[in-house]
Protein backbone atom coordinates (compact mmCIF):
# COMPACT_ATOMS: atom_id res chain seq x y z
CA UNK A 1 0.00 0.00 0.00
CA UNK A 2 2.83 2.37 0.86
CA UNK A 3 4.53 1.67 -2.48
CA UNK A 4 1.28 2.39 -4.30
CA UNK A 5 0.92 5.72 -2.49
CA UNK A 6 4.48 6.73 -3.38
CA UNK A 7 3.92 5.69 -7.00
CA UNK A 8 0.75 7.78 -7.28
CA UNK A 9 2.50 10.78 -5.73
CA UNK A 10 5.48 10.54 -8.11
CA UNK A 11 3.48 9.74 -11.26
CA UNK A 12 2.52 13.35 -12.14
CA UNK A 13 6.12 14.49 -11.67
CA UNK A 14 7.41 11.71 -13.91
CA UNK A 15 4.83 12.52 -16.57
CA UNK A 16 5.78 16.18 -16.55
CA UNK A 17 9.49 15.34 -16.70
CA UNK A 18 8.80 13.26 -19.83
CA UNK A 19 6.83 16.15 -21.34
CA UNK A 20 9.73 18.52 -20.74
CA UNK A 21 12.03 16.52 -22.99
CA UNK A 22 9.62 16.90 -25.90
CA UNK A 23 8.91 20.55 -25.09
CA UNK A 24 12.61 21.40 -24.87
CA UNK A 25 12.92 20.22 -28.45
CA UNK A 26 9.77 21.88 -29.81
CA UNK A 27 9.45 24.92 -27.53
CA UNK A 28 6.66 25.78 -25.08
CA UNK A 29 3.06 25.85 -26.29
CA UNK A 30 2.33 29.52 -25.63
CA UNK A 31 -0.45 31.51 -27.23
CA UNK A 32 -3.38 33.83 -26.68
CA UNK A 33 -6.68 32.44 -25.47
CA UNK A 34 -8.59 31.25 -22.44
CA UNK A 35 -11.46 29.00 -21.52
CA UNK A 36 -14.81 30.04 -22.98
CA UNK A 37 -16.31 31.13 -19.68
CA UNK A 38 -13.33 33.37 -18.89
CA UNK A 39 -13.65 35.08 -22.28
CA UNK A 40 -17.42 35.39 -21.78
CA UNK A 41 -17.02 37.06 -18.37
CA UNK A 42 -14.35 39.41 -19.70
CA UNK A 43 -16.55 40.43 -22.62
CA UNK A 44 -19.67 40.76 -20.46
CA UNK A 45 -17.94 42.97 -17.89
CA UNK A 46 -16.71 45.33 -20.61
CA UNK A 47 -20.04 45.44 -22.49
CA UNK A 48 -22.04 46.16 -19.32
CA UNK A 49 -19.62 48.90 -18.31
CA UNK A 50 -19.80 50.50 -21.76
CA UNK A 51 -23.61 50.28 -21.77
CA UNK A 52 -23.82 51.84 -18.31
CA UNK A 53 -21.43 54.62 -19.30
CA UNK A 54 -23.47 55.36 -22.44
CA UNK A 55 -26.71 55.51 -20.44
CA UNK A 56 -25.26 57.65 -17.65
CA UNK A 57 -23.27 60.04 -19.84
CA UNK A 58 -26.18 62.32 -20.95
CA UNK A 59 -27.28 62.71 -17.31
CA UNK A 60 -23.88 63.63 -15.87
CA UNK A 61 -23.04 67.07 -17.27
CA UNK A 62 -21.18 68.18 -14.15
CA UNK A 63 -19.43 64.86 -13.52
CA UNK A 64 -18.19 63.86 -16.96
CA UNK A 65 -14.57 64.44 -16.04
CA UNK A 66 -14.91 61.97 -13.18
CA UNK A 67 -16.66 59.46 -15.44
CA UNK A 68 -13.84 59.71 -17.98
CA UNK A 69 -11.26 59.08 -15.26
CA UNK A 70 -13.20 56.13 -13.89
CA UNK A 71 -13.61 54.66 -17.37
CA UNK A 72 -9.87 55.01 -17.95
CA UNK A 73 -9.13 53.21 -14.67
CA UNK A 74 -11.57 50.43 -15.51
CA UNK A 75 -10.21 50.06 -19.05
CA UNK A 76 -6.67 49.76 -17.73
CA UNK A 77 -7.78 47.18 -15.15
CA UNK A 78 -9.67 45.22 -17.80
CA UNK A 79 -6.58 45.14 -20.03
CA UNK A 80 -4.57 43.82 -17.07
CA UNK A 81 -7.16 41.05 -16.62
CA UNK A 82 -6.82 40.08 -20.28
CA UNK A 83 -3.04 40.11 -19.96
CA UNK A 84 -3.16 37.86 -16.89
CA UNK A 85 -5.86 35.43 -18.03
CA UNK A 86 -5.81 35.29 -21.82
CA UNK A 87 -2.25 36.11 -22.91
CA UNK A 88 0.68 33.67 -23.31
CA UNK A 89 1.52 34.50 -19.69
CA UNK A 90 -1.28 32.18 -18.55
CA UNK A 91 0.25 29.22 -20.37
CA UNK A 92 3.75 30.19 -19.24
CA UNK A 93 2.59 29.83 -15.65
CA UNK A 94 2.28 26.09 -16.13
CA UNK A 95 5.96 25.91 -17.10
CA UNK A 96 7.58 28.31 -14.64
CA UNK A 97 6.73 29.36 -11.10
CA UNK A 98 8.17 32.82 -11.80
CA UNK A 99 5.74 33.34 -14.70
CA UNK A 100 2.93 32.18 -12.43
CA UNK A 101 3.95 34.81 -9.88
CA UNK A 102 3.92 37.53 -12.52
CA UNK A 103 0.39 36.46 -13.43
CA UNK A 104 -0.77 36.52 -9.81
CA UNK A 105 0.81 39.91 -9.16
CA UNK A 106 -0.92 41.37 -12.23
CA UNK A 107 -4.25 40.07 -10.93
CA UNK A 108 -3.82 41.28 -7.35
CA UNK A 109 -1.78 44.49 -7.46
CA UNK A 110 -2.57 45.83 -10.93
CA UNK A 111 -5.95 44.64 -12.19
CA UNK A 112 -7.76 44.69 -8.83
CA UNK A 113 -6.97 48.28 -7.70
CA UNK A 114 -7.53 49.66 -11.20
CA UNK A 115 -10.93 47.98 -11.40
CA UNK A 116 -11.89 49.32 -7.97
CA UNK A 117 -10.92 52.85 -9.03
CA UNK A 118 -13.11 52.36 -12.10
CA UNK A 119 -16.20 51.99 -9.85
CA UNK A 120 -17.73 49.21 -11.99
CA UNK A 121 -20.69 48.37 -9.73
CA UNK A 122 -22.42 51.69 -10.38
CA UNK A 123 -21.77 51.55 -14.14
CA UNK A 124 -22.90 47.94 -14.41
CA UNK A 125 -26.11 48.89 -12.62
CA UNK A 126 -26.74 51.69 -15.10
CA UNK A 127 -26.45 49.20 -17.96
CA UNK A 128 -29.99 48.09 -17.08
CA UNK A 129 -33.21 50.00 -17.63
CA UNK A 130 -35.09 51.77 -14.86
CA UNK A 131 -37.07 48.67 -13.90
CA UNK A 132 -33.94 46.53 -13.83
CA UNK A 133 -32.06 49.06 -11.71
CA UNK A 134 -34.92 49.27 -9.22
CA UNK A 135 -35.11 45.48 -8.98
CA UNK A 136 -31.38 45.08 -8.43
CA UNK A 137 -31.33 47.93 -5.91
CA UNK A 138 -34.22 46.37 -3.99
CA UNK A 139 -32.45 43.01 -3.91
CA UNK A 140 -29.20 44.52 -2.63
CA UNK A 141 -31.06 46.41 0.12
CA UNK A 142 -32.24 43.21 1.76
CA UNK A 143 -30.88 42.89 5.29
CA UNK A 144 -29.05 39.62 4.59
CA UNK A 145 -27.36 40.97 1.45
CA UNK A 146 -26.36 44.21 3.14
CA UNK A 147 -25.03 42.37 6.17
CA UNK A 148 -22.99 39.97 4.00
CA UNK A 149 -21.57 42.80 1.89
CA UNK A 150 -20.77 44.83 4.99
CA UNK A 151 -18.97 41.86 6.54
CA UNK A 152 -16.96 41.10 3.39
CA UNK A 153 -15.91 44.70 2.84
CA UNK A 154 -15.15 45.53 6.47
CA UNK A 155 -11.47 46.52 6.31
CA UNK A 156 -10.21 43.97 8.84
CA UNK A 157 -12.22 41.15 7.25
CA UNK A 158 -11.09 42.07 3.73
CA UNK A 159 -7.48 42.16 4.94
CA UNK A 160 -7.84 38.74 6.58
CA UNK A 161 -9.49 37.20 3.50
CA UNK A 162 -6.71 38.49 1.26
CA UNK A 163 -4.06 37.26 3.70
CA UNK A 164 -5.71 33.83 3.98
CA UNK A 165 -6.14 33.39 0.22
CA UNK A 166 -2.53 34.31 -0.49
CA UNK A 167 -0.93 32.10 2.14
CA UNK A 168 -3.30 29.15 1.81
CA UNK A 169 -2.82 28.77 -1.94
CA UNK A 170 0.97 28.83 -1.59
CA UNK A 171 0.95 25.85 0.76
CA UNK A 172 2.62 23.18 -1.43
CA UNK A 173 -0.35 20.78 -1.37
CA UNK A 174 -2.79 23.52 -2.42
CA UNK A 175 -0.54 25.08 -5.06
CA UNK A 176 0.24 21.72 -6.64
CA UNK A 177 -3.46 20.83 -6.63
CA UNK A 178 -4.02 23.97 -8.70
CA UNK A 179 -1.22 22.95 -11.07
CA UNK A 180 -2.73 19.50 -11.55
CA UNK A 181 -6.39 20.51 -11.99
CA UNK A 182 -7.97 23.15 -14.23
CA UNK A 183 -10.87 23.45 -11.80
CA UNK A 184 -8.60 24.06 -8.82
CA UNK A 185 -6.54 26.48 -10.90
CA UNK A 186 -9.67 28.46 -11.74
CA UNK A 187 -10.64 28.45 -8.06
CA UNK A 188 -7.17 29.71 -7.12
CA UNK A 189 -7.32 32.61 -9.55
CA UNK A 190 -10.90 33.43 -8.56
CA UNK A 191 -10.01 33.58 -4.88
CA UNK A 192 -6.92 35.69 -5.57
CA UNK A 193 -8.87 38.20 -7.66
CA UNK A 194 -11.96 38.27 -5.43
CA UNK A 195 -9.98 38.72 -2.21
CA UNK A 196 -7.81 41.39 -3.85
CA UNK A 197 -10.90 43.27 -5.06
CA UNK A 198 -12.35 43.20 -1.55
CA UNK A 199 -9.03 44.34 -0.09
CA UNK A 200 -8.60 47.23 -2.50
CA UNK A 201 -12.25 48.21 -2.11
CA UNK A 202 -11.70 48.40 1.65
CA UNK A 203 -8.58 50.52 1.08
CA UNK A 204 -9.67 52.70 -1.86
CA UNK A 205 -13.37 52.25 -2.49
CA UNK A 206 -14.41 53.02 1.08
CA UNK A 207 -12.20 56.07 1.39
CA UNK A 208 -13.89 58.32 3.89
CA UNK A 209 -15.30 55.38 5.83
CA UNK A 210 -14.85 54.69 9.50
CA UNK A 211 -11.22 53.62 9.23
CA UNK A 212 -10.13 56.67 7.21
CA UNK A 213 -6.90 56.96 5.29
CA UNK A 214 -4.81 56.23 8.37
CA UNK A 215 -6.35 52.78 8.63
CA UNK A 216 -5.95 52.22 4.88
CA UNK A 217 -2.24 53.01 5.14
CA UNK A 218 -1.88 50.49 7.98
CA UNK A 219 -3.62 47.77 5.93
CA UNK A 220 -1.36 48.48 2.95
CA UNK A 221 1.79 48.46 5.09
CA UNK A 222 0.93 45.18 6.84
CA UNK A 223 0.03 43.57 3.51
CA UNK A 224 3.38 44.67 2.12
CA UNK A 225 5.03 43.03 5.13
CA UNK A 226 3.31 39.64 4.94
CA UNK A 227 3.54 39.34 1.14
CA UNK A 228 7.19 40.31 1.37
CA UNK A 229 7.73 37.65 4.02
CA UNK A 230 6.23 35.00 1.75
CA UNK A 231 8.35 36.18 -1.16
CA UNK A 232 11.45 36.07 1.05
CA UNK A 233 10.67 32.47 2.03
CA UNK A 234 10.63 31.47 -1.64
CA UNK A 235 13.78 33.44 -2.38
CA UNK A 236 15.85 32.13 0.51
CA UNK A 237 14.65 28.53 0.51
CA UNK A 238 17.26 25.96 -0.38
CA UNK A 239 14.77 23.51 -1.89
CA UNK A 240 11.95 23.66 -4.43
CA UNK A 241 8.48 23.83 -2.88
CA UNK A 242 6.54 22.55 -5.87
CA UNK A 243 7.99 19.34 -7.39
CA UNK A 244 5.20 19.20 -9.98
CA UNK A 245 7.01 21.88 -11.97
CA UNK A 246 9.90 19.46 -12.39
CA UNK A 247 12.43 20.89 -14.84
CA UNK A 248 9.88 22.70 -16.98
CA UNK A 249 11.45 26.10 -16.21
CA UNK A 250 14.40 24.93 -18.34
CA UNK A 251 12.22 26.02 -21.25
CA UNK A 252 13.06 29.57 -20.14
CA UNK A 253 16.65 28.84 -19.16
CA UNK A 254 16.00 28.45 -15.43
CA UNK A 255 16.63 25.61 -13.03
CA UNK A 256 13.90 24.70 -10.52
CA UNK A 257 15.49 26.57 -7.61
CA UNK A 258 16.40 29.59 -9.76
CA UNK A 259 12.82 29.72 -11.00
CA UNK A 260 11.47 29.65 -7.45
CA UNK A 261 13.91 32.31 -6.26
CA UNK A 262 12.98 34.57 -9.16
CA UNK A 263 9.29 34.09 -8.38
CA UNK A 264 9.95 34.96 -4.75
CA UNK A 265 11.80 38.12 -5.73
CA UNK A 266 8.89 39.14 -7.97
CA UNK A 267 6.48 38.80 -5.06
CA UNK A 268 8.89 40.41 -2.60
CA UNK A 269 10.21 43.47 -4.47
CA UNK A 270 7.75 44.66 -7.17
CA UNK A 271 4.80 43.31 -5.20
CA UNK A 272 5.87 45.06 -2.02
CA UNK A 273 6.61 48.27 -3.90
CA UNK A 274 3.03 48.38 -5.22
CA UNK A 275 1.57 48.35 -1.71
CA UNK A 276 4.19 50.86 -0.54
CA UNK A 277 3.45 53.21 -3.45
CA UNK A 278 -0.30 53.04 -2.81
CA UNK A 279 0.28 53.81 0.86
CA UNK A 280 2.52 56.77 0.03
CA UNK A 281 -0.07 58.18 -2.38
CA UNK A 282 -2.80 57.93 0.25
CA UNK A 283 -0.48 59.47 2.83
CA UNK A 284 0.36 62.38 0.52
CA UNK A 285 -3.31 63.02 -0.20
CA UNK A 286 -4.10 62.82 3.50
CA UNK A 287 -1.42 65.38 4.35
CA UNK A 288 -2.48 67.66 1.50
CA UNK A 289 -6.21 67.57 2.25
CA UNK A 290 -6.09 67.23 6.04
CA UNK A 291 -7.17 64.33 8.26
CA UNK A 292 -10.81 64.54 7.21
CA UNK A 293 -11.20 62.78 3.84
CA UNK A 294 -13.62 64.14 1.31
CA UNK A 295 -16.83 62.20 1.65
CA UNK A 296 -17.87 63.11 -1.90
CA UNK A 297 -15.41 60.52 -3.17
CA UNK A 298 -16.46 57.81 -0.77
CA UNK A 299 -18.80 55.94 -3.07
CA UNK A 300 -18.94 55.06 -6.76
Which residue ranges define each predicted feature?
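Alpha-helical membrane segments of multi-pass proteins
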Residues: 2-3, 16-300
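Sec-dependent signal peptide recognition
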Residues: 1-9
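Hydrophobic h-region of N-terminal signal peptides that target proteins for export
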Residues: 8-17
Amino acid sequence: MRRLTVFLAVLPVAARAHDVQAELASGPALGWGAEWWVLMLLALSLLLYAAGLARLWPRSHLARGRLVRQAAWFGAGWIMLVLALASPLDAAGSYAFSAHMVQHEILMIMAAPLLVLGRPLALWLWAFGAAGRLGIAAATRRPGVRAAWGALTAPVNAWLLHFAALWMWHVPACFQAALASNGMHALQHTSFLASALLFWWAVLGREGGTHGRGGAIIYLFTTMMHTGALGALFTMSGSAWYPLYGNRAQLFGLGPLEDQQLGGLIMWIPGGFAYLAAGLVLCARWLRQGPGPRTAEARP
